Regions:
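Terminal helix-turn-helix DNA-binding modules in bacterial transcription factors
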Residues: 179, 183, 187-193, 200, ...
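A short, N-terminal "cap"/entry segment at the start of jelly-roll beta-barrel domains
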Residues: 1-18, 26-30, 106-109, 131
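Short, Lys/Arg-enriched, Trp-marked, Pro/Gly-tolerant hinge/linker segments that flank
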Residues: 108-116, 129-144, 148-187, 191-198, ...
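Solvent-exposed, amphipathic alpha-helical segments
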Residues: 45, 117-128, 176-184, 228, ...
Length: 277
């Protein structure tokens, strides 16, 4: 079976930065940071989580809590003994427009017992957090990045994402078409060919794609192409080369599609992102 996550991580980087390894006692607030979410591991102790939801979240067993996008949240624990945490900032390249960050709900909480596939990397991560070996910080950071891939695998395997790209990648038929789009965005993709990738008729494929992913295949492909174009612009590549790589005939065609998607020309977007010299 084709690797459903390979193109996502190949094109759009994710970086973790560990910032907490130990107890948090009483009330601890985390303000949103532009372009970064957080991945928290609660090893032991009870936690009340306040993050703007109608009801507060109670964690009473070892759990992971992922915020893929910036969101203010507050932990309330026993003021004397607290709860044991290991936490990392998670920076998705492109921020909230990163395909994975955009595809996930505002927060995900999973008991560690519900993600048995993560047991080995969690054991390594917790052991490293308790030790003082040289290279501890980069080791923890890389282990958090590996853990994030495991979490995505588990979310897809358990069907916990109900709509959007990850739901499409979890679908037994649609995932073949999505992987094909991700792997060859420069190609023209007639509806008939995508339907064949999914083993469906044109009508059934189009309706299923829209219901599960939330857009038409054409709109999805354009969004994926523009995301790749933005990555190329962040890397300082020439627009004409980007256009060829993502399936547009030239700079003018890419600029039109870019403006239709973002409301800005590529030059305006680079300036707004602080990428102009």
């Amino acid at each position: 079976m084709a690797d459903r996550l390979a193109a996502l991580f190949a094109h759009f980087a994710v970086r973790a930065e560990t910032f907490q390894t130990g107890p948090l006692c009483g009330v601890n607030s985390l303000e949103p940071q532009a372009g970064r979410g957080q991945l928290h591991l609660v090893r032991d102790g009870g936690v009340e989580v306040h993050h703007g939801a109608p009801e507060l979240l109670r964690i009473d067993e070892p759990s992971l809590l992922l915020y893929p996008r910036p969101l203010a949240h507050r932990f309330v624990t026993d003021p004397s003994c607290g709860a044991q945490f290991v936490c990392a900032h998670v920076a998705f390249e492109g921020g909230a427009s990163h395909p994975i960050a955009a595809a996930l709900p505002p927060w995900v909480c999973l008991p560690l017992a519900a993600v048995p596939g993560c047991a080995r990397v969690l054991g390594q991560l917790f052991a490293e957090a308790e030790a003082s070996h040289c290279g501890r910080q980069p080791m923890l950071d890389r282990l958090f990045e590996v853990l994030l891939i495991w979490v995505l695998r588990e979310l897809m395997a358990q069907g916990r994402v109900q709509s959007g790209m990850l739901a499409g990648l979890s679908h037994p038929r649609l995932r073949g078409a999505l992987v094909a789009l991700h792997d060859a965005p420069q190609r023209e993709w007639p509806l008939e060919e995508l339907a064949a990738q999914a083993g469906m008729s044109r009508t059934v494929f189009a309706n299923t794609f829209r219901d599960v992913v939330g857009s038409t295949p054409g709109v999805y492909l354009q969004r994926w192409r523009i995301g790749l174009a933005q990555k190329g612009l962040r890397e300082g590549r020439a627009l004409k080369h980007i256009a060829a790589d993502v399936g547009y005939g030239g700079e003018a065609a890419l600029s039109r599609a870019f403006r239709a998607h973002t409301g800005q020309s590529p030059r305006e977007w680079r300036k707004a992102e602080g990428l102009m010299n």
